Amino acid sequence: MVITLVGEKLAKPGLEFIYYGPGEPCKTCRLARVCIGNLEPGRRYKVIKVRNIEHPCPLHEGKVRVVEVVEPAIEVLMEPRYAIAGSKLTLRFVDCNDPEKLDLVRPEGLFEGDTVKIIEILGDVECNGRKFKLVKVMREKE
């Protein structure tokens, strides 16, 4: 669990967001260490709790709220031979060029080379005449 700040409109339990990096106003903000210092660019986060503390912010339409976030489980396609529930492995993206499946081939929030734990096998997906497994994974932090 990570404590951070998000715009008031995003401060809702269950809401997910991708952190893309600091905005220009963040570079001189006194709250930057708490707000963006705990987040990793390119990662997906899920708000699990909203605290009753708010601060002014020029980037987020006036106000940010203190929230608790976690990295959620993410769905990704995987080679069937590696798709074993409970196993940990180094993530390798599959070769699938179907634009409709891009969010499952290279989901935002995961990077090739991440260590992940397979939480659940969700089913089979075909792409380019090959069968892959759709799995739900959690990133394992080093």
Curated annotation (Swiss-Prot):
InterPro entries for this protein: UPF0179
Annotated signal sequence range: none
Family from the record: Belongs to the UPF0179 family.
PANTHER family: UPF0179 PROTEIN MJ1627 (PTHR40699:SF1)
The protein's name: UPF0179 protein PYRAB06360
Organism: Pyrococcus abyssi (strain GE5 / Orsay)
Lineage: Archaea, Methanobacteriati, Methanobacteriota, Thermococci, Thermococcales
